[in-house]
């Protein structure tokens, strides 16, 4: 069975897709999960499947439409964390002490979060898990701040430089987590980036990021993100 890395961008925007391609994708999903009811209303606006071994595109639909990746933005922050671990700048056991600001961000319930307590030590491994699984904005910012010495602009520069390096030509990062900086109620305020702007990327660019992530740091799968295997596809 081929190893597949599926980057399915479930962006609910006004941009339409061709009915034939979208319906085909819904039919494919229904065949993969015959016991589940796949509602066509949930069909993705952009979708892409690539071979995890080669990066070759196996399925595509509207892959170059620029959209807001929302919480999928956290993939780039995590990529930079894993890169820093490989470079020896920190380890999964490195301890980061939560600040009152971190706790305050965690209490912003309008954005995805989990409980963070000021003064408590969290390992990088724990923060990665909380970023990847419950999609915590607070822990994402904690990791970003650690790598940038608490300079959000520096970290955004790092994100955009890495996107350019990887060939993500239609990507622009304005925040580290997928929530516009203004959503943090003054607790996360980059100075050189528009605090009201949403991140911008495409399904193709996210596939590039996902391909390099799995290729360069495969332990993200299984250790932090569950892996589900389907046969005969």
Can you describe what each PLM-predicted range is?
Residues 22-203, 214:
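Active-site-adjacent loops and short helices of periplasmic peptidoglycan-processing enzymes
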Residues 8-15:
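Bacterial N-terminal signal peptides
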Residues 8, 135, 227:
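Residues that line or immediately flank small-molecule/substrate-binding pockets and catalytic motifs
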């Amino acid at each position: 069975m081929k190893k597949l890395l599926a980057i399915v961008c479930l962006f609910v925007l006004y941009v339409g897709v061709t009915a034939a391609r979208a319906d085909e994708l819904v039919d494919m999903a229904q065949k993969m999960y015959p016991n589940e009811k796949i509602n066509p209303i949930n069909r993705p606006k952009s979708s892409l499947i690539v071979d995890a071994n080669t990066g070759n595109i196996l399925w595509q639909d509207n892959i170059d439409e620029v959209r807001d990746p929302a919480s999928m933005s956290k993939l780039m922050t995590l990529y930079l964390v894993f890169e820093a671990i490989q470079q020896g700048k920190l380890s999964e056991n490195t301890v980061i002490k939560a600040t009152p600001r971190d706790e305050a961000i965690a209490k912003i319930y309008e954005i995805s979060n989990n409980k963070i307590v000021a003064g408590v030590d969290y390992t990088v491994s724990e923060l990665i898990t909380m970023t990847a699984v419950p999609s915590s904005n607070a822990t994402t910012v904690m990791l970003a701040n650690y790598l940038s010495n608490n300079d959000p602009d520096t970290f955004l520069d790092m994100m955009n430089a890495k996107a350019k390096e990887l060939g993500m030509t239609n990507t622009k990062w304005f925040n580290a987590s997928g929530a516009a900086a203004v959503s943090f109620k003054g607790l996360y305020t980059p100075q050189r980036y528009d605090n009201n702007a949403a991140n911008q990327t495409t399904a193709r660019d996210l596939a590039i990021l996902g391909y390099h992530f799995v290729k360069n740091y495969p332990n993200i799968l299984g250790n932090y993100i569950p892996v589900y295997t389907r046969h005969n596809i």
